[in-house]
Amino acid sequence: GNERSIVTSVYNRIAIDCSRVAIRHVRLDSNGRYLETIDSGLNNCLTIEANKDQSYVMFIRDVVQSLFDEGCIAIVPIDTVVDISKATSYDIETMRVGKITQWYPDNVKINVYNDRKGIHEEITMPKNKVAIIENPLYSIMNERNSTLQRLIRKLNLLDAIDEQSGAGKLDLIIQLPYVVYTEA
């Protein structure tokens, strides 16, 4: 995961903002204009709950935070109305964020949480059956000499200096059990 620093709070804020954007499964006309919202399992995932552990808001936050951490992720359909290996069209009932661990010409190996077993598992799926999302700024944000990495190093250095300057000093407030009177 990303470093526990001020950058984490910035990433978290971006993820929260993204999770508040309304995403819907809709039908468009021939000019690309909105016609109607489709009542589907996919729309349910995008507006109510993505899976039994995550609301749609937490799911989108997971997507965005994973993009910051990994750079490229897969949104994996977990439960579908029909077997997706045999169908060209299907309705998604639940989905999860997965980390892509291996690339193949037509498939990807994905580390994804199995909520039935309570563990992460490696699965291989066709690329055309998962949504592969890439953070276009990942390499820029994580390059050794990027502005963000320089800022992280400087903030960590300032934190270390603050820690050292406070070390070895003892700040105490002493309260005596009786009233002390002095002549003024």
Locate each region found by the language model.
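Structured, contiguous alpha/beta core segments that scaffold functional sites
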Residues: 1-184
